Amino acid sequence: MKFSILPMIASAMAVSISYDPIYAADLSMGSVACSNGDHGLMAQYPTLGEVPGFPNVGGIPDIAGWDSPSCGTCWKVTIPNGNSIFIRGVDSGRGGFNVNPTAFTKLVGSTEAGRVDNVNYVQVDLSNCINGAN
């Protein structure tokens, strides 16, 4: 029997989640890694606020740079206390999650912490991000 550990590796890695006010509704999609190209989102959504799932958007670990195949994907992010949220990837997270402040507040309770470490994450169906599951 053959098992693949690749899906488990992503969620087992220790990453952090932080927030950045740059991920505002009026931010041009031309400013993020998922702007244009084959996997770009700008043609459909000129501003970040138009992306279904906003404000639960931001940089994710699986987007390394421009035109990543992970652009627009949905991720369930769980912090150590068990709280979780769905985040739609629109930018590079540079090894972690960096999200809209409102999404961070939904997850953590406030922006006071600034960052939470030891975050688990797993890719989920896009419907979790666009159907108001948060």
From Swiss-Prot:
> In practice, how is this protein used?
Generated Asn-98 mutant protein displays improved cellulose weakening activity, thus making it a potential candidate in the production of biofuel as an enhancer of enzymatic hydrolysis of cellulosic materials.
- Which first-to-last residue range defines the signal peptide? 1-14
Please describe the relationship between pH and activity: Optimum pH is 5.0 for the non-enzymatic cellulose weakening activity.
A single BP term in Gene Ontology: modulation of process of another organism
Q: Does the keyword Signal apply?
A: yes
Q: Spell out the residue ranges making up region: Binding of N-acetylglucosamine tetramer (GlcNAc-4).
A: 31-43, 65-68, 91-95
One GO term in the molecular function aspect is: chitin binding
Temperature and thermostability: Optimum temperature is 38 degrees Celsius for the non-enzymatic cellulose weakening activity.
* Keywords for the protein's UniProt record, in alphabetical order: Cell wall, Disulfide bond, Secreted, Signal, Toxin
Name the Pfam families for this protein: Cerato-platanin
Record's subcellular location: Secreted; Secreted, Cell wall
Consequence of substituting V77A: Altered protein stability due to dramatic change in structure without altering the net charge of the protein. Dramatically altered thermal resistance and thermodynamic stability. No change in cellulose weakening activity in vitro
- Subcellular location, principal: secreted
Question: Which superkingdom, per the lineage?
Answer: Eukaryota
Disulfide bond sites: C34-C71, C74-C129
Instruction: Extract the ranges annotated as region (Binding of oligomers of N-acetylglucosamine (GlcNAc)).
Output: 18-20, 113-116
Q: State whether it acts alone or in a complex, and with which partners, per the record.
A: Monomer.
Q: Which family does it belong to?
A: Belongs to the cerato-platanin family.
Function, as annotated, reads: Phytotoxin which causes production of phytoalexin in platanus acerifolia, platanus occidentalis and platanus orientalis. Induces cell necrosis in tobacco leaves, and in callus cells and leaves of P.acerifolia. Induces reactive oxygen species (ROS) synthesis, nitric oxide (NO) production and mitogen-activated protein kinases (MAPKs) phosphorylation in the leaves of A.thaliana and P.acerifolia.
Name the UniProt record assigns to this protein: Cerato-platanin
Species annotation: Ceratocystis fimbriata f. sp. platani
Which gene carries the instructions for this protein? cp
